[in-house]
Structures are given as structure tokens and as C-alpha cells.
């Protein structure tokens, strides 16, 4: 709570401010909307902070700013206060001799009130750029007190529930979401520069597909049919490649009815893209170029500090198969142990890791990888050769049909991207869908449905294609050194 009401609780402050608003209304205050801002605080600071005090006085620079009062010092017949706009803060100097009526009103305004200020720039004796107010106008009366300026919102969950207050009080939060916006803009620039077409595909699907995940279910009243919030746009984007759009991308939300953690949110943002006449090796090269561009454009560095360690995007990204990664981080494991179901079961039993009796060799290998290796992949790393049995939409390897031409991209121990050469054999895809249906019937809630319309689209002919999905929320976490995915989502879902 602000220093003006340190001895009052929030309800008492709210009551006092409501009374002030009632008095303002009696005097004709009606939340005016005629003041026009012409300058932002940060732009003025950048332009004039280095200007000498005497030179600035000779220039007679007139400005018009607006923002929220976040600090004020009333000193008899003169006061200083800071206003905060989207770009930053600037100081204002107000004298009773210049504006006696306004000054008397100002003494009754509160931190959090939004004002418009017109005046002339000058520098104080300490060198701080300041506006000598010639006109000050109350634009919005704030009824609720701001958090303490030194501590902000101390309750982390309250930050998520009342993000609007967090953004007022916490400069780091504002920076996080500005970086998020700049990152998404940079994604679009890179995709557009590489001749990809941005498209929009349905958010409600008659058949969930495109990923192994549990969907949210809803009902379309007019059509009287069950619909599913999309878990991935993949099958619709590939339909567009069938239709002749050879490079497409979409930045949008996906929804998965699964657990919440520091790395998972049921509603999340993805960049997903597809390129005809390319394979997964092309996409790994493309991804390296993309991440170099994002680092240069958004952060102006290719070395990022995350949770006390440095991620180096300058070096070539390491590429390891699933088996190679297991052997690298488990030097005691022999390669032949990974080649049989019994060998993998023994390894998992020794480590105390659960598995199902129905899990095949590939699934057992992935359990071992995900539970013991994934978290150790701190530097940018591509993991390749994912088993066919867990990759129902990916093309089989020409050299080993038990694995696919697929990669997952890891940074700081978490999956950031998933890409592969697309399966464009309609008969093979239909058979894999049938196996997914068998798994669903056996109780796997994340297994895929059989999508006959997608099979029909493949039967028209999908050119050789590669596709990739990149998790934007997790990438923002890295770029902003954030510990939780909820720190980078403006309004994350919370338990009521």
C-alpha cells in the first residue's frame, strides 16, 4: 500500500477515495477524454538527458505527457511527482504560485491517479530531467491503492490473478511482456522474409488431432455435434500444403486438457510451420538460423543467462539420436542394452522408473530418455531418431523403419520445438491411425482418433514436406530468465 495511507487498510483507503471521487463529481469531474499526449517519458529522457542544463533552458522545450502518479513529494508551495507511462517515468515540478487552483487540488490527489501534464523541460540542480508544469489535469481517479513501491505484489499468485496491478507496480513484469511481444514480432518477420504465408486454421475441431494429448471437449448447439478445442493445427496446415500453399505458418493458441506446472499451461501459444520439398535436416538448419535471428533482433546477444547459467547460441547446436543421448549421459549403459525390450525394462527397473507391460521398445527408450536425460540438455540440442511407435505423423527413416525422421529441440532441459519430415503415404498414415485407435480403446486418453478426411487429403497427394512446432511461452521464459511459464502468460489459469 502507498505511503500516504500506511496506517489504513485497503477498505478504508477505498472508502476515502470514493468520497474524493464524489466530491470531484460535484465539482464537474467526469473522467475527461480531451487531453492529448504528444510525448513519451522514455523518448524525452533519451533525447534530452545529456543536454546541458543551461542549453535546455535556452531551448524552451514544450512537452505534453500523460500517465499514472507513482511518486510525489509535497513541500509547502511546491511539489515534485513522477508519472509513469508505457515507456517509463519522468519527474514533474508543480508550484502553487504558477497554478494555485490546480496545486490545491493536487494535494488531494492520490498515487495511482492518471493525469495529463503540459509544460517546459528543465533540469534540477541534481541533473534530473523534469517538466515545469504549466497545465495539469486529472484524467482518471484511482479508487484502489497501489502496492508498496518497494515490495510490489509480494504474493506470487496474486500477481497472476491481478496482472494489471503487477504491471503497474513491477517494471520487470512489464519488460517480460514487452520482450514477449517483440519475440512474436521477430518470429513473423523471419517467417515472412523466408516466404512463408501466415494462415489461420480452426480453433474448434470435429476430430482432435495433430498431437498426442487429451483435448478439451465442447458442444456446438446449432450443429448439434461434439467439438474439441484444438490440441495442434498440424492436420489443417498440411491440408493447405496439399492445396498448393507450399510454405505456411500459424502463431496461435493450442489447448491440452492436462496438468499445470512451471513448464505446462493448458492454454499455450505455438508457432507451427510447414515447408514443401524439405526434410527434417533442412528444418534443423532453418531452426538454427531462426534462433540466431531471434537473439540478434530481440536481445542483441547470442549468449543468454538463464537461472545462473549461460546458454550459448553461437556454437553449432549439438545433434544426437535418442540412443546416443542416453549413452552420453549414462556412460555405464551398454548400447546393446537399448536394443531389446528386456534390456530396457531391466534398466528402468534398476532406476525405479514405471512403465506399462504393453510398452514397446521405442516407448521404453523414450521413458529412459525423458526421465533421466532430457533435464540435462542445457545447451541447444537436437535429439533425433524418435521411435515410430510414438511418432504417428512422422515419416519413417529410410535406413531404419523403427525410427522416424524426427527431432525435438531442447534448451535448458526442456523441449522447445518438435519437427519432422511429414508422413505423406496415405496408406501408412491410415495404418498408424488404426493403431492409435486401438491404443485409445485400450484406455490411452492421449491417443489419436482416426481422421478419414485427413487421409482423403493425403490421397490427393502431399508433396515431400517437413513441419515444426515451437513453443513460444517456453522460449519467452528463456529470453526473460523466468522460472515459471505463468510468469510469461499475461493471464494464466488458476484454481478458483
From Swiss-Prot:
InterPro entries, per database record: Aa-tRNA-synt_II, aa-tRNA-synth_II, aa-tRNA-synth_II/BPL/LPL, Lys-tRNA-ligase_II, Lys-tRNA-ligase_II_N, Lys-tRNA-synth_II_C, NA-bd_OB-fold, NA-bd_OB_tRNA
Molecular function (Gene Ontology), one example: tRNA binding
Protein name: Lysine--tRNA ligase
Species: Legionella pneumophila subsp. pneumophila (strain Philadelphia 1 / ATCC 33152 / DSM 7513)
Predominant place of localization: cytoplasm
PROSITE patterns (alphabetical): AA_TRNA_LIGASE_II (PS50862)
Assembly description: Homodimer.
Record bears the keyword Transmembrane helix: no
Keywords assigned: Aminoacyl-tRNA synthetase, ATP-binding, Cytoplasm, Ligase, Magnesium, Metal-binding, Nucleotide-binding, Protein biosynthesis
Amino acid at each position: 500500500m502507498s505511503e500516504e495511507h500506511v496506517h489504513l487498510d485497503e477498505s478504508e483507503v477505498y472508502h476515502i477515495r470514493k468520497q474524493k471521487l464524489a466530491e470531484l463529481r460535484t465539482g464537474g469531474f467526469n473522467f475527461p477524454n480531451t487531453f492529448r499526449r504528444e510525448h513519451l517519458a522514455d523518448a524525452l529522457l533519451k533525447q534530452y538527458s545529456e543536454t546541458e542544463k543551461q542549453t535546455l533552458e535556452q531551448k524552451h522545450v514544450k512537452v505534453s505527457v500523460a500517465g499514472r502518479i507513482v511518486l510525489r513529494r509535497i513541500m509547502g508551495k511546491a511539489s515534485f511527482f513522477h508519472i509513469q507511462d508505457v515507456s517509463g517515468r519522468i519527474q514533474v515540478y508543480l508550484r502553487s504560485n504558477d497554478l494555485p487552483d490546480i496545486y490545491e487540488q493536487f494535494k488531494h490527489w492520490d498515487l495511482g491517479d492518471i493525469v495529463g501534464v503540459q509544460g517546459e523541460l528543465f533540469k534540477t540542480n541534481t541533473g534530473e530531467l523534469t517538466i515545469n508544469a504549466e497545465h495539469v489535469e486529472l484524467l482518471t481517479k484511482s479508487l484502489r491503492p497501489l502496492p508498496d513501491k518497494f515490495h510490489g505484489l509480494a504474493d506470487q499468485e496474486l500477481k497472476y490473478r491481478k496482472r494489471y496491478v503487477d504491471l503497474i507496480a513491477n517494471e520487470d513484469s512489464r519488460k517480460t511482456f514487452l520482450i514477449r511481444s517483440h519475440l512474436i514480432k521477430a518470429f513473423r518477420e523471419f517467417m515472412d522474409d523466408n516466404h512463408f504465408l501466415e494462415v489461420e486454421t480452426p480453433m474448434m475441431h470435429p476430430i482432435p488431432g495433430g498431437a498426442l494429448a487429451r483435448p478439451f471437449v465442447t458442444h456446438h448447439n446449432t450443429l448439434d455435434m461434439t467439438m474439441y478445442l484444438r490440441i495442434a493445427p498440424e492436420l489443417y496446415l498440411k491440408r493447405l500444403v496439399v492445396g498448393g500453399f507450399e510454405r505456411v505458418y500459424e502463431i496461435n493458441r493450442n489447448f491440452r486438457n492436462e496438468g499445470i506446472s512451471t513448464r505446462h499451461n493448458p492454454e499455450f501459444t505455438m508457432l507451427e510451420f510447414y515447408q514443401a520439398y524439405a526434410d527434417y535436416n533442412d528444418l534443423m538448419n532453418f531452426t538454427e538460423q531462426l534462433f540466431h535471428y531471434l537473439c540478434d533482433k530481440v536481445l542483441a546477444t547470442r549468449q543468454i543467462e538463464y537461472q545462473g547459467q549461460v546458454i550459448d547460441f553461437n556454437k553449432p547446436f549439438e545433434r544426437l539420436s535418442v540412443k546416443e543421448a542416453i549413452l552420453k549421459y549414462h556412460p555405464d549403459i551398454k548400447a546393446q542394452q537399448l536394443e531389446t525390450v528386456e534390456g530396457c525394462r531391466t534398466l528402468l527397473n534398476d532406476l525405479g522408473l514405471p512403465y506399462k507391460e504393453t510398452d514397446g521398445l521405442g516407448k521404453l527408450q523414450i521413458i529412459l530418455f525423458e526421465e533421466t536425460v532430457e533435464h540435462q540438455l542445457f545447451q541447444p540440442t537436437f535429439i533425433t531418431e524418435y521411435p515410430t511407435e510414438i511418432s504417428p505423423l512422422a515419416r519413417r527413416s529410410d535406413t531404419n523403419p523403427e525410427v522416424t525422421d524426427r527431432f525435438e529441440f531442447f534448451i535448458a532441459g526442456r523441449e522447445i520445438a518438435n519437427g519432422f519430415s511429414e508422413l505423406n503415404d496415405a496408406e501408412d498414415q491410415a495404418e498408424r491411425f488404426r493403431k492409435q485407435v486401438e491404443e485409445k480403446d485400450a484406455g490411452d486418453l492421449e491417443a489419436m482418433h482416426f481422421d478419414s478426411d485427413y487421409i482423403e487429403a493425403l490421397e490427393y497427394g502431399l508433396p515431400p514436406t517437413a513441419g515444426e512446432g515451437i513453443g513460444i511461452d517456453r522460449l519467452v521464459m528463456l529470453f526473460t530468465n523466468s522460472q515459471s511459464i505463468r510468469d510469461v502468460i499475461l493471464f494464466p489459469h488458476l484454481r478458483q
